[in-house]
Amino acid sequence: MEKKNQNTNKKIIQTSNKQVHQMRDTRTKNASQKRSKKHRKKQVFGRQSIFAGGFCIVAALAIVIGIFVSNKTKTPYEKQVITLYEKENESLAEQQTNPEAGMDEGISSGLKQVRDYGVKLPESFQNPPIFESTFTSTGDTVLDTANRYAAMYDYDKAIETIQAVSGYESNAEYTKALEEYDLEKSRLFQWNDNYTITHIFFHTLIVDPEKTFDVSLSSKAQVIAYNEAMTTIDEFVKIIQKMYDDGYVLVGLHDVAEMVTQPDGTQIMQMKPIYLPAGKTPFVLSQDDVCYYEYMTGQGFADRFVLDENGKITNEYTLDDGTVIRGSFDVLTILEDFIEAHPDFSYRGARGTIVVTGYNGIFGYRTSDYWYNWNCEYFDQQNAEERQRMYYNNENIEADKAAAKEIAAAMKELGWTIASHSWGHIYIGSSSYGRVCWDSDMWEREVAPLVGGTDIIIFAFGEDLDGWQGYAADNEKFLYLKQKGFDYYCNVDASSEHWIQIGANNDYFRQARRNLDGTRMWEAVMSYTDSSYHNRLSDLFDARDIFDPARPTPVE
């Protein structure tokens, strides 16, 4: 059944991600045939496996995202059609047996549109191994909840969950579980050095590389920028799968270090113990610019976050014919699917950090009064020329704010943290003190009320406030940001696997982040055949296994 989007009046189809990814991969395969694939295979990568064919990549991407519709085994084709907006009083079981049974004209039309994009998967991929859940349900809600806590290494919470049940002592399954939790807890080790924890980050994921890398849809300069700074969904899925297979476990910034109140009332930053089984390695993850900027519209990226009918965060993506589909098309939603299947990838429920500016709104909603409200009471002449160029009145701005606020609350409920990226995506180091103050005030005014504030600032462009030695006591920008409540500061530096600093006065936490994007992966790929390139990712994965052949090369 079709729905109408109040703002866009476009058709919305609830679907699994396989549909849009299969569409994209089919188009990408056709586009890649136009390039000199044979030459790149021989001269650039030095190995055949990465180009084993778009076929495997098509299938892998199509089957790994959003497949958890129910516990019942379905064929790939059934999975594709089963999550279309349900029709009232329609039998789900009948749909699983016959995807077209009982569907009205609107649904049938929607299915035809989906089929027209070539979504049906090859028969050989009816039993996909990727994102196959490692968590086994017992059928007991309490026990399943406790087991999920235990899988995330939070044995105390698992024990509390069981012991909260009246009469648990007489339940053999519960008492056995408690014994197992105690045993597994005793086997944990404290991570030996929090200073060695790496921090990786991404920008908005590319859903459709053919569109993203099409100069006719943007510009040559923009395509180059996308190719350098962005990561495709194919690459992201392979990265997290590889890291999971190698024993990496996601921790939050607040798991690494925390502000501790002293007896005299002062607070100092201290490393926080992390307890994991032997063979596990903690890492931090963040994603920059989760705003779905207007300039990216129609260029192969998700449009925005929305909450589905169950209150779950999902993405919207617009097809070429204007049909809007929903699914997991970006870091947060894909990672949620992955953690649902692999709870042991998350340390005590930890998630990543979502990093937002404010000038263009957040999460795909145009929430900035400064840019989008004719009646903005605090507009001044600063940036007047740029404002005139971008400015239009968003008649739905209050509804957009409310929606963004709900999204932020849902993110935090899942365990995600939200960080400032500055309001205007400014160069924090080279900007004047006055500019930094004005920008910080704007983020506090326009974004903080929507996301609930934050103590994390992740600098735009990777630029920092000061040199590696530390923030000087008289650094007025740092003092102003500290006054605003920021305790965690992150830049970009991929020159080493990890870099962390706690201030000389124990008043801040500072960490370098590593960009896992086209630039870094291309450097890593080329390093195998050209010594002038440096491989900065070898501790995480072999970039030749990750690099998406849909990318234009060289990436530079």
What is each stretch, according to the model?
Residues Q95-G102, Q262-D264, N393-E398, G470-D474, ...:
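Intrinsically disordered, low-complexity coil segments
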Residues G139, A150, D156-Q163, G167-N171, ...:
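C-terminal active-site subregion of NodB/CE4 polysaccharide deacetylases
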Residues Y195-T212, G265, M269, L276-F283, ...:
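Metal-dependent polysaccharide deacetylase catalytic core of the NodB/CE4 family, i.e.
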